[in-house]
């Protein structure tokens, strides 16, 4: 599109980015689909895995899809690093018809089904392609037919077209943040990206999870200013750190008081997401406004 163009052509979404339209046959139907975003290292995989476990405790059939080349999204559910879709495709010279479900889908805690999409080497390819191929494989093998909940755990705070690919499938996006400036700044960018995509996709913002935070005052100030909402608060508990070291979800840990507190919050979050949330119309804040709101005096 030329800089002189004054209108965005039909078929594009957000800031002039080209929208890749999904084939109808590749759409996920019959399940509630959530995409989990947040600043790199904020605890998205911990949040996603414990949320998947919580949904399973509520009796839901859950599939978690890790969308990070590190392929560690599901290791607390499975207890190991499982092969990625991109790796098993390489093994068959990218002939997906030669793959069996057991080659790339692994059962984890309480029956949660786990898939690691993986990704191309750094600086090459597009992560969005890998996500698309993963969903196609799942559809071809009818692995989504009996699923109630699908959770995409998405790489870092990347909001390019590639790693926005899960938004094409998601009903709602959940943002993981912390009670600090950098995390909230990243959340603001993610809100802008999701809102742009929601012009043409069904995805809507569900809200944020304040993770590894003793307090939530900064998160709450931002939410008030942006008409966003906080869905849950996961305190900075050593039990959560230990669960990662033990390769377990909180629901597989011994029942000490901190573990029970965190479990209860995840179960409450899962139930609220399942029941559905009132619609909202959040807006991202200009950079200067965030600095004035949360920056140092």
Curated annotation (Swiss-Prot):
It is an enzyme of class 1 (oxidoreductase). SUPFAM superfamilies: P-loop containing nucleoside triphosphate hydrolases (SSF52540). One of its GO terms (biological process) is light-independent bacteriochlorophyll biosynthetic process. CDD domains: Bchl-like. InterPro entries: NifH/chlL_CS, NifH/frxC, P-loop_NTPase, Protochlorophyllide_ATP-bd. Pathway: Porphyrin-containing compound metabolism; bacteriochlorophyll biosynthesis (light-independent). Pfam families: Fer4_NifH. The keyword Plastid does not apply. It catalyses: chlorophyllide a + oxidized 2[4Fe-4S]-[ferredoxin] + 2 ADP + 2 phosphate = protochlorophyllide a + reduced 2[4Fe-4S]-[ferredoxin] + 2 ATP + 2 H2O. Its EC number is 1.3.7.7. Binds 1 [4Fe-4S] cluster per dimer. Mg(2+) binds at residue 45. The keyword Oxidoreductase applies. Its cofactor is [4Fe-4S] cluster. Gene3D superfamilies: P-loop containing nucleotide triphosphate hydrolases (3.40.50.300). Keywords: 4Fe-4S, ATP-binding, Bacteriochlorophyll biosynthesis, Chlorophyll biosynthesis, Iron, Iron-sulfur, Magnesium, Metal-binding, Nucleotide-binding, Oxidoreductase, Photosynthesis. [4Fe-4S] cluster binds at residues 126, 160. NCBIfam families: DPOR_bchL (TIGR01281). Component of the dark-operative protochlorophyllide reductase (DPOR) that uses Mg-ATP and reduced ferredoxin to reduce ring D of protochlorophyllide (Pchlide) to form chlorophyllide a (Chlide). This reaction is light-independent. The L component serves as a unique electron donor to the NB-component of the complex, and binds Mg-ATP. This is Light-independent protochlorophyllide reductase iron-sulfur ATP-binding protein. It comes from Cereibacter sphaeroides (strain ATCC 17025 / ATH 2.4.3).
């Amino acid at each position: 599109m030329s800089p002189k163009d004054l209108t965005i052509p039909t078929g594009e979404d957000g800031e002039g980015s080209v929208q890749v339209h999904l084939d109808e046959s590749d759409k996920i139907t019959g399940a509630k689909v959530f995409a989990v975003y947040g600043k790199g290292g904020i605890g998205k995989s911990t949040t996603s895995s414990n949320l998947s476990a919580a949904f399973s405790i509520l009796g839901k059939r859950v599939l978690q899809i890790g969308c990070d080349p590190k392929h560690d999204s599901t290791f607390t559910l499975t207890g190991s690093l499982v092969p990625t879709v991109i790796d098993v495709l390489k093994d068959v010279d990218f002939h997906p018809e030669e793959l069996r479900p057991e080659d790339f889908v692994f059962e984890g805690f309480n029956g949660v089904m786990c898939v690691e999409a993986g990704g191309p080497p750094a600086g090459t390819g597009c992560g969005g392609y890998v996500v698309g191929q993963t969903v196609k494989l799942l559809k071809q093998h009818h692995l989504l037919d009996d699923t109630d909940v699908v959770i995409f755990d998405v790489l870092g705070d990347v909001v390019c077209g590639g790693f926005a690919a899960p938004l094409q499938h998601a009903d709602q996006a959940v943002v993981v943040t912390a009670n600090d400036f950098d995390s909230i700044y990243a959340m603001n960018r993610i809100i802008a990206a999701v809102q742009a995509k929601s012009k043409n996709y069904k995805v809507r913002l569900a809200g944020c999870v304040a993770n590894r935070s003793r307090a939530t005052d900064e998160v709450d100030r931002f939410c008030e200013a942006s008409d966003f909402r906080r869905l849950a608060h996961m305190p900075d508990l050593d039990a959560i750190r230990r669960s990662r070291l033990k390769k377990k979800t909180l629901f597989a840990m011994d029942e000490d008081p901190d573990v029970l507190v965190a479990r209860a919050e995840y179960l409450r979050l899962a139930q609220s997401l399942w029941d559905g949330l009132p619609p909202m119309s959040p807006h991202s804040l200009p950079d200067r406004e965030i600095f004035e709101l949360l920056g140092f005096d």
